[in-house]
Regions:
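Long, contiguous binding/interaction regions
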Residues: 1-83
Length: 83
């Protein structure tokens, strides 16, 4: 079976997010002062061949832990669906 996986990687709460701060300041400078608490992350989409949804999720968690996310400074969320 093939599964489409959406991975959302975000900086851990409480850690400095320089990109988020830069975007927040730029938004304020452009007149969007109501925007606050901006955090910048990234989205990754991939297809995984696996025998089941739990197997696909486990494999992608391994990918995240080893490459796609920094486990010290980032958290990630997965959404798994049949392709």
């Amino acid at each position: 079976m093939s599964f489409r996986v959406h991975v959302r990687v975000m900086p851990r709460g409480g850690l400095l997010d320089p990109q988020g701060q830069a975007v927040e300041h730029a938004l304020a400078a452009l007149g969007f002062a109501e925007a606050g608490g901006v955090r910048v992350g990234r989205a990754i989409e991939l297809e995984v061949a696996a025998g089941s949804r739990p197997e696909a999720e486990a494999r992608v968690r391994q990918m995240c832990d080893k490459l796609l996310a920094n486990p010290v400074t980032e958290d990630y969320l997965l959404e798994v669906e049949e392709a």
